[in-house]
Amino acid sequence: MTAAQRYEQLWRELVACDELGFDFGFTVEHHFNPNESWMPSPAIYCTGAAGRTRKMRHGPMGFVVPLYDPVRIAEDAAVLDNVLNGRLELGLVSGIVPDFFGPYRADFKNRRDLANEALVFVKKAFSTEGPLSFEGPFHQYQNVTLSVKPVQKPHPPLWMQSRDADTLAILAQEGVHTGYLFLVPRHEVAPRYREYLTRWNRAGHSTKPNIGYWVLIYVDETDDKAVAKARAYFTHCFTKVFGTRADGGIGYLRLAENFTKRGDPGGAEIAKNAVNLDYLLERNLAFVGSPKTVTAKIKAAAAEGLFNTVLGEFNIGDIAEEDLMRSIRLFGTEVLPELRSFEPY
């Protein structure tokens, strides 16, 4: 499949999801892996999605902050919220893949502090009338006037995926939604998100916090059909899509190495075994099965891991479009209605 063909398929996915009542369409920002990173510009994704959907909310999950000047993020976000007519969800991330940073001459060491600074700047930029001045640890501005302001006031909903306790404390205080990946053991991080929820409520925000959970999903008519189809797609995903990188490293094994370096043996163990579908299914780390089974899996995982937003990856590996669209349709018609009334917190 060429990049152009993949984009056309993506638009067909989004149209189907919009018609079925999906809430969000997010994109990650990845770079420099021809097998996988075909959407290096979240802003372009949002622009394309805006003209093809009517109800879904879209956004980056998120802009890799150290690769940008914060003013650029604020300007892009303001324009996108207008293009989307108030449907932007603005995600910011610090970035975890060192490969992205070198060609951009970006600061990997201070990435977390840069992301936190950008969060403060964006909120101030969108709430300031007239010229803006800002004094941050990395960026300083005097008399900057944004020519476009977002439709949503005071700003679009903000997201920052994190499992760091100190960062989560900041996000709860600032009213920023969060989330994490299936590679992170749910039972290990649940206490941190419980504290995040407590702090959010204590801060008195008028909205409810969203905690997202990124996970691979395949739904078919029966469990046996789903597992049989998913096995090949998952294998291709983790050996080809997240497979050999430019430096010769194997994607999922390098993820395991990164988790180990950060002192996270639980994440390293999941990453090392991600290529094994049986391992994932036994631990409920992939939602594969009939609509009834997938519904039960999601509810159990959400109760354990304290998430209320499923960031589902349906386009897995080299999945056939017929299977992809069937999975999306079954999820939208039979799983989604069952989840509407389910509240894990």
Language model features with spans:
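Acidic (Asp/Glu)-rich catalytic clusters
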Residues: 18-19, 46-54, 77, 81-87, ...
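An alpha-helical appendage that flanks or caps ligand/catalytic pockets
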Residues: 109-147, 187-307, 340-345
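N-terminal beta1-alpha1-beta2 module of alpha/beta enzyme domains
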Residues: 1-52, 56-57, 153-156
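Flexible, glycine-rich active-site loops centered on histidine and acidic residues
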Residues: 1-5, 66-134, 178, 184-186, ...
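Glycine-rich, proline-tolerant flexible connector loops at the mouths of alpha/beta enzymes
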Residues: 24-48, 64, 96, 184-186, ...
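Hydrophobic faces of well-ordered beta-strands that scaffold small-molecule active sites
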Residues: 25-27, 58-60, 88-92, 158-161, ...
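Conserved, mostly hydrophobic/aromatic
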Residues: 29, 49, 80, 122, ...
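Active-site mouth loops of central-metabolism enzymes
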Residues: 1-7, 63-71, 152-162, 218-220, ...
